[in-house]
């Protein structure tokens, strides 16, 4: 099940943790959940500035100090900034954020693994035996023949798209599918996404997808 209590996304300073304090029993429960969520991408967040967006009436100065100390020690962030979560921002818990995006201008070859805590756009191919993992969307401007894991942090809105979608395996938010033995190349770009907990693949339609 998707955890909508804390949402992590990129921003111009580094990373932004949007926290819905209404869904936590107390501060310590929230802190444990935040540390657990950030720990999954610790190597990406090291040295980053973290902006914590939440309803500040739930957190006092002592707790703010504790949160900073824990995150400095365990996640190795560089700085921590707090900002008030406005009412209009509540929509983030049901909406989709693109977050930060990385462009990779190379082919992912057999035995290589590409991992990123955001969206990945690969200008090249993903060969058989190659592996790509991303917290967000994975877009391959070429042939996708290896393994791709999108929404690797539980993002059920992530998609996988490629000019030619012939994967060994694709996964979105932990849901996995493999190409059938009688798979036939379509000759047009396709998009894989989740629909009612199942991965479906459909032709790419520019008017339908506006990521």
UniProtKB/Swiss-Prot annotation:
InterPro entries (alphabetical): CAP/MinC_C (IPR016098), MinC (IPR013033), MinC_C_sf (IPR036145), MinC_N_1 (IPR055219), Septum_form_inhib_MinC_C (IPR005526)
Signal peptide coordinates: none
GO process terms (BP): cell morphogenesis; division septum assembly; regulation of cell septum assembly
Alphabetical list of SUPFAM superfamilies matching this protein: Cell-division inhibitor MinC, C-terminal domain
Domain of life: Bacteria
Keyword annotations from UniProtKB, A to Z: Cell cycle, Cell division, Septation
Subunit-level organization: Interacts with MinD and FtsZ.
Matches recorded under PANTHER family: SEPTUM SITE-DETERMINING PROTEIN MINC
Function of the protein: Cell division inhibitor that blocks the formation of polar Z ring septums. Rapidly oscillates between the poles of the cell to destabilize FtsZ filaments that have formed before they mature into polar Z rings. Prevents FtsZ polymerization.
Similarity annotation: Belongs to the MinC family.
Listed name of the protein: Probable septum site-determining protein MinC
